[in-house]
């Protein structure tokens, strides 16, 4: 029996081989115990403040929304140590692993940000680290591969399937099934089998808690909408969690539209997928009529995932959150626009959320909107990818 509810409505669960059930139940018990231990909470908070650099600022853009009455704020997770929101929950899970007596950490990564965050946490806490990464993503994200190795992690390229994040996830789970006695699988997003979606949300929810308090201080009211990109869904659930009960605040998740939904080359299971079981959970996923997982696509490695966390599936099904898609081109335009107008280079993942916020502001220029975009990471890792695209298209003006 689980201690916590493994489902969000009909979504979630523990659809894993029997061999992994004891490991998941052990993890759940350790998490519940840790959440009730003031010493654990204090150590986690100290690491977030003194090592990671929380709280992160809520920055009002000065130039981006000129010509509209929108006040657009950026929640600056890009300023966190490690360069993205990933550091938050990685520190929490790594502390949990030490508490459980584990000596090794297994992780998967797409854009490399989760791998970097895991490597830095393992270096800090004295844990061995191995990271599975799709071979295609290793090519797309060479700077992050080097960062991981520099901090002592072993990076294992995965050549099976589409050589991307879903394949890295499968290999990491296989490894954990054989080594969970001394290893913890440090999952990088709010997806997968219970208790991972709950653990990751709880270790990310300070994003929304801070943003809410900061918005009250600056605007003396709640925002009209909070907007975040959605791959597996950790940065979005971190932003949404504290606003779920504030029904007047729109929760908008932005999935990768890739080359356009009609092309079939996208990563938008919530908007254009169907229900099924994948990666240990029941959620929405991209699958064919035979139930075979279809390959997702996005210019952004961190959003290139064919499913989504179960809490997002639930929020979509009850109408509490809305999920839209943004194409590669729209995200690349927003990437360049933020850099030129504010001097901030965002991650390609975050650029999807930014692009939708700009659409909202410009579609109703006379409306006095207060919008918060979760700028989930910085764009250093993406500059070579973007430079190649801009060079081919001749679009760097």
Curated annotation (Swiss-Prot):
Q: Which residues form a coiled coil?
A: none
The cross-references to Pfam families, in alphabetical order and at most eight, read:
PALP
Q: Name one GO molecular function term.
A: tryptophan synthase activity
Q: Which reaction does it catalyse?
A: (1S,2R)-1-C-(indol-3-yl)glycerol 3-phosphate + L-serine = D-glyceraldehyde 3-phosphate + L-tryptophan + H2O
**Which pathway does UniProt place it in?**
Amino-acid biosynthesis; L-tryptophan biosynthesis; L-tryptophan from chorismate: step 5/5
- Give the superkingdom in one word: Bacteria
Q: What is its EC number?
A: 4.2.1.20
- N6-(pyridoxal phosphate)lysine modification sites are 86
What enzyme category does the UniProt record give? lyase
List, alphabetically, the InterPro entries matched: Trp_synth_b_CS (IPR006653), Trp_synth_beta (IPR006654), Trp_synth_beta/beta-like (IPR023026), TrpB-like_PALP (IPR001926), TrpB-like_PALP_sf (IPR036052)
Keywords noted in UniProt = Amino-acid biosynthesis, Aromatic amino acid biosynthesis, Lyase, Pyridoxal phosphate, Tryptophan biosynthesis
Q: Name any GO cellular component annotation.
A: cytoplasm
PROSITE patterns in the cross-refs: TRP_SYNTHASE_BETA
Q: Which cofactor does it need?
A: pyridoxal 5'-phosphate
CDD domains (UniProt xref): Trp-synth_B
State the NCBIfam families in the record: trpB
Report the family membership: Belongs to the TrpB family.
> What is the purpose of this protein?
The beta subunit is responsible for the synthesis of L-tryptophan from indole and L-serine.
Kindly state the subunit structure of this protein: Tetramer of two alpha and two beta chains.
Protein name per Swiss-Prot or TrEMBL: Tryptophan synthase beta chain
């Amino acid at each position: 029996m689980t201690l916590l509810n493994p489902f969000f409505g009909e979504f979630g669960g523990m659809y894993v081989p029997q061999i992994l059930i004891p490991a998941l139940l052990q993890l759940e018990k350790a998490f519940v115990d840790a959440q009730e231990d003031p010493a654990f909470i204090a150590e986690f908070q100290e690491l977030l403040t003194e090592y990671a650099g929380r709280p992160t600022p809520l920055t009002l853009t000065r130039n981006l929304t000129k010509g509209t009455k929108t006040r657009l704020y950026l929640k600056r997770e890009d300023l966190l140590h490690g360069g993205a929101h990933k550091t938050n929950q990685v520190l929490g899970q790594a502390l949990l692993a030490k508490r459980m007596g584990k000596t090794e950490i297994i992780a998967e990564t797409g854009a490399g940000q989760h791998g970097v965050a895991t490597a830095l946490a393992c270096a800090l806490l004295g844990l061995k680290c191995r990271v599975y990464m799709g071979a295609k993503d290793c090519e797309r994200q060479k700077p992050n591969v080097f960062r991981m190795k520099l901090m002592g992690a072993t990076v294992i390229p995965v050549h099976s399937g589409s050589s991307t994040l879903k394949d890295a996830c499968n290999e990491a789970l296989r490894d954990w099934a054989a080594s969970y006695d001394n290893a913890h699988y440090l999952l990088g997003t709010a997806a997968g089998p219970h208790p991972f979606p709950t653990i990751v949300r709880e270790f990310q929810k300070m994003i929304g808690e801070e943003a809410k308090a900061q918005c009250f201080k600056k605007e003396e009211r709640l925002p009209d909408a909070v907007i975040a990109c959605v791959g597996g869904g950790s940065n979005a659930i971190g932003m949404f969690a504290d606003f779920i009960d504030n029904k007047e605040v729109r929760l908008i998740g932005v999935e990768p539209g890739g080359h356009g939904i009609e092309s079939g080359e996208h990563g938008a299971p919530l908007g254009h997928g169907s229900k099924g079981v994948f990666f240990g959970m029941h959620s929405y996923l991209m699958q064919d009529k035979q139930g075979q997982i279809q390959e997702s696509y996005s210019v952004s490695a961190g959003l290139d995932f064919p499913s989504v966390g179960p809490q997002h599936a639930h929020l979509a099904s009850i109408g509490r959150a809305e999920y839209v898609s943004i194409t590669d081109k729209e995200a690349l335009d927003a990437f360049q626009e933020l850099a030129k107008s504010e001097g901030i280079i965002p991650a390609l993942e975050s650029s999807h959320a930014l692009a939708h916020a700009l659409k909202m502001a410009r579609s109703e220029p006379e409306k006095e909107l207060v919008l918060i975009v979760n700028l989930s990471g910085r764009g250093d890792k993406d500059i070579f990818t973007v430079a190649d695209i801009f060079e081919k298209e001749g679009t760097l003006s």
